[in-house]
Amino acid sequence: MFLLHEYDIFWAFLIISSVIPILAFLISGVLAPIREGPEKLSSYESGIEPMGDAWLQFRIRYYMFALVFVVFDVETVFLYPWAMSFDVLGVSVFIEALIFVLIPIVGSVYAWRKGALEWS
């Protein structure tokens, strides 16, 4: 027979953690005042009247730097457990970690040489 009673706490936590956000949205939708008007549609710029049109398109070049940051941040997350158990692990694991670090570095140097990190 299945031992589903072992997971009762999990199911209770899952149900409660699903019901709380739903209740929060429902209660705020019922209690919040609905006010529509020109002030609701205007952009707020630190209490100053906006100058010009707020719907301008412009190129954002930060995505490449954000992507590089995320890659190295994830790499740091994976290297932390390795660093904590460095004395127990052998030389082969050190070489594997070195390769793991070198792959994003080589990719970043390649992207830099190709001009992907240049402002244009």
Swiss-Prot record:
GO terms for molecular function: NADH dehydrogenase (ubiquinone) activity; quinone binding. Its main location: plastid. Disulfide bonds: none annotated. Its EC number is 7.1.1.-. GO terms for biological process: photosynthesis, light reaction. It is found in: Plastid, Chloroplast thylakoid membrane. Keywords: Chloroplast, Membrane, NAD, NADP, Plastid, Plastoquinone, Quinone, Thylakoid, Translocase, Transmembrane, Transmembrane helix, Transport. The keyword Repressor does not apply. It catalyses: a plastoquinone + NADH + (n+1) H(+)(in) = a plastoquinol + NAD(+) + n H(+)(out); a plastoquinone + NADPH + (n+1) H(+)(in) = a plastoquinol + NADP(+) + n H(+)(out). The chain crosses the membrane at residues 9-29, 64-84, 88-108. Pfam families: Oxidored_q4. InterPro entries: NAD(P)H_OxRDtase_bac/plastid, NADH_UbQ/plastoQ_OxRdtase_su3, NDAH_ubi_oxred_su3_sf. Belongs to the complex I subunit 3 family. NDH shuttles electrons from NAD(P)H:plastoquinone, via FMN and iron-sulfur (Fe-S) centers, to quinones in the photosynthetic chain and possibly in a chloroplast respiratory chain. The immediate electron acceptor for the enzyme in this species is believed to be plastoquinone. Couples the redox reaction to proton translocation, and thus conserves the redox energy in a proton gradient. This is NAD(P)H-quinone oxidoreductase subunit 3, chloroplastic. It comes from Calycanthus floridus var. glaucus (Eastern sweetshrub).
